[in-house]
C-alpha cells in the first residue's frame, strides 16, 4: 500500500479552500449574459470553447493532492446540480465558494464548525421555503422561451426552438439534441410512437418515392416469439382479410415460409401487410411490446398470458390510424388505446424512473414515457465549425434542462434577484447561539454572490448594483444584458425555481462538509519521503509540520 500523508486542522482546511478557489474562479467567469468563455484543451482534436460551468469543472484536475480534494468536492456540487436540475452549475459553484470563504474566516477565529454548519443548514432551509413562496408556475410558451433563452446565455433563437419543440410534443415529450448539418438550427418532430426497427423486406414498400410502407387504419399483431410457420398465422390472416384492413406484424422475427407468404400476398394485393422485428432485447423488448399494446388497444400474443397465434382474434389485435414503416424506423400514429390505460402505464413507468439507479435505465424509461404520452422532437444544432456546434450544443442542453425544471417547480426572477429577496425575507432568522448566528450570516452574505458575479462579469461595480437591487422590491433587479434596472420577469429574465433551489442546497451541503473537515489523508508524492502529520504538536524531531 502506498504511503500516505496526513494534514490536520487549519493546514488541511487552508489547502482545501485553495483548491475550491482555483476551480470556482475558473468556473464563475462564465456566469451571466456577459459571462466569458473558457477554452478547454483536448488530447486529440481541436480545443473546446465553452460557457458551460459543469464542462469547465469536469476538466479540472489539480497537481497538489489536497487542493485537488477541495476542487473535486466543488466539482461534485456542479455535477449534482447538473444531474438534478440540468442547469445552475455555475451558480452552485459560486455559492459554494462564498460559503466556504466566509465560513473559513469564522473557523479560523475559533468558532465551533459544527454550530456554524447547523446555522448554515437552518438558513438554507428557510431560504428554500422562501424561494417556494415567491415561485410562480410557468403557464405560457413565452415564459418557457424566456427561461430557455436565459439558460442559453441570452440566445433567443435557442429559446424559441425549445419552446416550439415543447409546444409540438408536449411537456411529457422527449426532446433530444443532435449535431446539425447546416449553419441554421433545425427542429424535427416525430408525432406518435416511433421505434428503431424497419421492414423485414423491401417488397412491403408501397410508397417508392419515400421508400416507405404506409398502412391506413391497420390491425397490429404483437408477438414475442419468432414466426416462421405460415400455418400459425393463417387463422388471424383470414380474419384480417375478411375485415378488409391491412396488418402490421411486430414479432421477435418473421422468417422463412411465413415471410415469403406475406410478401407474395402483399405483391398480389390479396392482403396488405408489413412485418417488422420487435424493438429492444430481453425484458426491455417485452416492456416495449406491452407499451405498444396499451397504446394501440391490443394485447401481446404470448404464452405467458395463455394466448397463442393459432387462436388469436381481431379483439386481441391493436389498431392505429396510420403506420409508416421505413428501412430503419416504424412510426405508429394515433393508436386506439384507452387513455386511462395509457395514463396508468405512464404512472407505472414513472415509478420505475424514481427507483432506477443507472442513468442509462432512467433515460430509456423516460423515452418510453415520452412515446406513450407525447412524441419525440430532435433539435439539430447548426454552426460554421465543429467547435461552434459543440459549444452551442452544450448551451441547448442546459436550456432544455432549465425549461423542464421550470415546468416542474415554476420560475423566480433571474439575475440573482430571487436570492436577494430571499436574503431580505430571512434576515431576522435567529440561531440557538452566537456560533449558529454566524452560520446564518455566512449564508446571508453568500446569497448576494451570484448577483455580484453576474455584475462583475458585465464589467460593472458589484457593490453599487447589489445595494440598488436590495433597495427595490419584488421582481425589481439589474438586467446585465442591457445594463438597465427594471422588472426582470417582464423583461424575460427568469430562473427555474428548481435550479436555484438545487444550487443552494448542494452548495451548502458540500461547503458544510469542508468547514467541518479537520484532517486530510492523501497519497504521498512518489519522489518524497512521507512527512509527519502537519499541525500535530510535537510531531517529529522539529515539531509540527517538519520532516523527520
From Swiss-Prot:
EC?
Answer: 5.6.1.7
Q: Does the keyword ATP-binding apply?
A: yes
Query: What GO terms are given for molecular function?
Result: ATP binding; ATP-dependent protein folding chaperone; isomerase activity; unfolded protein binding
Q: Report the superkingdom from the record.
A: Bacteria
The cross-references to InterPro entries, in alphabetical order and at most eight, read:
Chaperonin_Cpn60_CS, Cpn60/GroEL, Cpn60/GroEL/TCP-1, GroEL-like_apical_dom_sf, GROEL-like_equatorial_sf, TCP-1-like_intermed_sf
**Record's subcellular location:** Cytoplasm
GO BP terms, alphabetized: protein refolding
| Binding, ATP | 30-33, 51, 87-91, 415, 479-481, 495
- Where along the chain is composition biased (Gly residues)? 537-548
* Keywords of the record: ATP-binding, Chaperone, Cytoplasm, Isomerase, Nucleotide-binding
Q: Which GO terms describe its cellular component?
A: cytoplasm
Q: Which SUPFAM superfamilies does the UniProt entry name for this protein? A: GroEL apical domain-like (SSF52029), GroEL equatorial domain-like (SSF48592), GroEL-intermediate domain like (SSF54849)
Q: Which reaction does it catalyse?
A: ATP + H2O + a folded polypeptide = ADP + phosphate + an unfolded polypeptide
Location of the region described as Disordered in the Swiss-Prot/TrEMBL record = 524-548
Regarding protein family, the annotation reads: Belongs to the chaperonin (HSP60) family.
Q: How does it assemble?
A: Forms a cylinder of 14 subunits composed of two heptameric rings stacked back-to-back. Interacts with the co-chaperonin GroES.
Checking NCBIfam families in the record gives:
GroEL, PRK00013.1, PRK12849.1, PRK12850.1, PRK12851.1
Fetch the HAMAP family from UniProt.
CH60
What's this protein's name?
Chaperonin GroEL 2
Q: Which organism was this protein described from?
A: Burkholderia pseudomallei (strain 668)
Gene encoding the protein? groEL2
